Amino acid sequence: MASLVNNAYAALRTSKLELREVKNLANFRVGPPSSLSCNNFKKVSSSPITCKAVSLSPPSTIEGLNIAEDVSQLIGKTPMVYLNNVSKGSVANIAAKLESMEPCCSVKDRIGYSMIDDAEQKGVITPGKTTLVEPTSGNTGIGLAFIAAARGYKITLTMPASMSMERRVILKAFGAELVLTDPAKGMKGAVEKAEEILKKTPDSYMLQQFDNPANPKIHYETTGPEIWEDTKGKVDIFVAGIGTGGTISGVGRYLKERNPGVQVIGIEPTESNILSGGKPGPHKIQGLGAGFVPSNLDLGVMDEVIEVSSEEAVEMAKQLAMKEGLLVGISSGAAAAAAVRIGKRPENAGKLIAVVFPSFGERYLSSILFQSIREECENMKPE
């Protein structure tokens, strides 16, 4: 079902939505293209029915039907749900925004669309000609790859080898070329490799998710308004992980414009806590803690940064599946752990905390998140 109602996506709807005028009902064709069209079906006499060959091009879109014109129109308007069982001890209400329910199962679907669309509108990329190049921890790459596939772009992605196997498979399934980089170098190594590929690839363009204003812009125009609308403006605290900085910066700015009293709290891995004065380092919370401060991160919009360890994030992600029925990724576990910690503060009694769950758990089956379950399943024998 087409779910986008925000103005940011209005440009997607083109004149193709207008049903061409039907001058002769006998020639009107609906449904999948066919090689033959009978134009005398109205006749009831014994006269023979004559048929004519028609074009195999798709028929015009039928106006008024609740059908998305293409996959990009499925992005956004994700639901929110209260956390009831992992939030024991919290004096605040905690509601999660399930970005795991995007068409490609992560919040990065939004920026995959927005960055490609923005570059097209600026005339700097062309379908069938431009090769897109981008460093990714996986989810942004997937968000870019499915839009690139739908619009006819070649795409080359660089990714630390420490990211989950599911990410590799999904990216290849969308036709992306994937280059793995040294995991010890983190995202910085992936960025350096992408820049190297960019220089030697003709007609290539890097979308630069860490620096591209179209990243926080789409969250300001869509994710923020969605949270405000779904909470009817009653959100008191917004919690999100810090990766590219796009989600927390865009949503945080929108919410603070609507209500300056809204608190915006970011999350970073304890093992790579550069925003808290620490040093970059390896960690297990895929998608967070890039090891540097992205240009897209608006430090001024955040009221606080909370550290969550990889161990705590993994454990909470497991609890979300077992106790809430929400199969989400490790960064969602980190977000939930931080939200519950904030919710236990006495001063937050009765407040509403909105937290973003960035991705679906099925993308992490080969990771540490499900290691024990995976080993158990591998050792199962038929009875």
From Swiss-Prot:
The molecular function terms in GO held by this entry are: cysteine synthase activity
One GO term describing the cellular component:
chromoplast
Q: What is catalysed by this protein?
A: O-acetyl-L-serine + hydrogen sulfide = L-cysteine + acetate
Signal peptide residues on this chain, from the entry's feature table:
none
* Pathway of action: Amino-acid biosynthesis; L-cysteine biosynthesis; L-cysteine from L-serine: step 2/2
Q: What is its EC number?
A: 2.5.1.47
According to the UniProt record, activity depends on pH as follows: Optimum pH is 7.5 to 8.5.
Q: Which BP terms from GO are recorded?
A: cysteine biosynthetic process from serine; double fertilization forming a zygote and endosperm; pollen tube growth
User: Per its UniProt entry, what is the enzyme's top EC class, as one word?
Assistant: transferase
What are its cofactors? Answer: pyridoxal 5'-phosphate
What does the UniProt entry say about where the protein is found?
A: Plastid, Chloroplast stroma; Plastid, Chromoplast
Question: Is this entry keyworded Transferase?
Answer: yes
Q: Which InterPro entries match?
A: Cys_synth, Cys_Synth/Cystath_Beta-Synth, CysK, P-phosphate_BS, TrpB-like_PALP, TrpB-like_PALP_sf
**What family is this protein classified in?**
Belongs to the cysteine synthase/cystathionine beta-synthase family.
Q: Which PANTHER family match?
A: CYSTATHIONINE BETA-SYNTHASE (PTHR10314)
Q: What protein does this entry describe?
A: Cysteine synthase, chloroplastic/chromoplastic
